[in-house]
Structure formats: C-alpha cells, structure tokens
C-alpha cells in the first residue's frame, strides 16, 4: 500500500505540479518514512526508484564537499530491507547466493549477489547475521523483483519480512565515526566496528 504524505508540502517548485502533493497520487511515487522530516527542512524532492527522494538541501556541491571533508547523512530508505528466518535458513539462502553463510557469525556482514536459476546475476546485496535470522539489503531499483524472486524460490519454512516502514540511513565521510560516537550508548565500542562488522545501537 502506498504511503501518503498529505500533511507535508512539496518543497521543490520544479516538481510541484499545480500545488498537488504527488504522494497522494495512487499510481505515483511513494514517500519514504522520513519524507515529512526532509520536506520540513527544505529537502528538494525528486522521483527515484518509485519514491520521492531528497536529492539536496542547500546545494549539491556544498553538501558533496562537506561530506568529503567531514561527514554526511543520506536517506537510502528506498532500498529493500529484508529479514529472513526459519528452519534450514542458511541452506535455503545459500541456494540463491554464492557465499557460505555457515561461517557468517552474528554481528558480521558480507557482500554477495542474488542469482537466478542459471547462475546469472540479478542484483548485488549485503547480508548480516543477527542471532537466528538474516538481515538483507537489496537495491531500490530492483527491490520488488528481488523480493519476488526470493519468495518464489525460498521454501515455505522460511519467513521473509519486508521492513518497508523502517528508514535506512547511510553515514559517510572521514568524520563518520566521530559523528556516530555521539549517538551510541550501552558501552558499544566503535573500535570493534571494523570492516564488514555491524552492531545494534
């Protein structure tokens, strides 16, 4: 079901057609979970991968340079966040990804590919292990095809949940760790978050 954002106002006059909110159109793009937050702060919204996305605030060049020198936060909630669980999970998912999940420990993640029946590449993705389930992030442009492929080829014992109401943020730049450190608690050490490691915060 499409998420509407009737209470927000489209910021960019480039995409504001006759003052109507495009997110109310049933066949149009959907809104991200943080849509209202972006619009209230002047985000310029453009259509991408079936969603209204904040492409910039004050200016692309300034934001690019700031991220290169400091850190920038990007809303990538259009990407597919999936949770998989059930008996025989590793073997079932390994039939679709060319990696060994048995060696993937909790708090670790791997880059992999989603394959078709002939071994052809459908998409690239990230997969993490959390206790008894896997968390997977697939690309936004191919998300629905990926979900359909997974549901078609995974056995009935495997549950696939699409976290479409959860935001996904990417913190990037040389000062990203310093920025993140101000927002974590519970004794989490960022020193332990080396390449391909992850943690709940």
Where are these regions (language model features)?
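Basic, glycine/lysine-rich polyanion-binding surfaces/domains
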Residues: 1-201
């Amino acid at each position: 079901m499409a998420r509407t954002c009737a209470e927000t106002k489209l910021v960019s006059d480039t995409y504001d057609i006759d003052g109507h909110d495009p997110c109310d159109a049933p066949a149009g793009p959907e809104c991200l979970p943080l849509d209202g937050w972006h619009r209230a702060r002047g985000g310029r919204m453009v259509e991408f991968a079936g969603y209204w996305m904040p492409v910039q605030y004050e200016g692309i060049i300034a934001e690019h340079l700031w991220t290169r020198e400091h850190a920038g936060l990007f809303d990538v909630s259009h990407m597919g966040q999936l949770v998989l669980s059930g008996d025989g999970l590793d073997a079932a998912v390994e039939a679709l990804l060319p990696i060994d999940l048995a060696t993937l420990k909790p708090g670790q993640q791997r880059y992999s590919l989603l394959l078709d029946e002939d071994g052809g590449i459908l998409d690239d993705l990230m997969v993490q292990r959390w206790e008894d389930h896997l968390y997977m992030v697939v690309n936004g442009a191919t998300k629905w095809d990926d979900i359909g492929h997974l549901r078609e080829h995974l056995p009935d014992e495997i549950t696939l949940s699409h976290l479409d109401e959860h935001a996904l943020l990417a913190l990037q730049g040389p000062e990203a760790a310093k920025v993140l450190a101000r927002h974590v608690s519970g004794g989490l050490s960022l020193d332990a978050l080396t390449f391909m490691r992850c943690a709940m915060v």
